[in-house]
């Protein structure tokens, strides 16, 4: 099944149909990952933003998180990346259920399997982190989420966890542009020097 055809999560599917009525020009469908399949860096976020990827159909575009993330990536000259989300549909109240997260896991696995040169996965937020841990058969009870954690998933692949670059995290001071930049500088160092 293609991600655009997925209707597995009835709550999300109905929510997107309601949003399409309210915002007829918006994408309002599941959002697939974006970027080059030859990328060595994959960024995994939570889910499409209402006025971001839910509008454009491209992860991390057109909203606060996307603008901040892409500005930082441009600033450090990290232009070759693949970007996706743990949950492919905009979740009501920005809170996907456990079942909705599980339903999207197979799409994440398929995307990651296509990235043959992948060296680093950067997760933005705990939900994305837990999904990647699960995809690689690790336990989130053993590998607890912590900002800046670096975990070797296998001989070729490293996971770096980060807080999400959400407006809430930035405005409350939990996270900063500098912290985000530092995460991606670590990713670039791993790609360039192992």
Regions found by a protein language model. Give the residues of each.
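A polyanion-binding, active-site-adjacent surface
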Residues: 1-153, 157-193
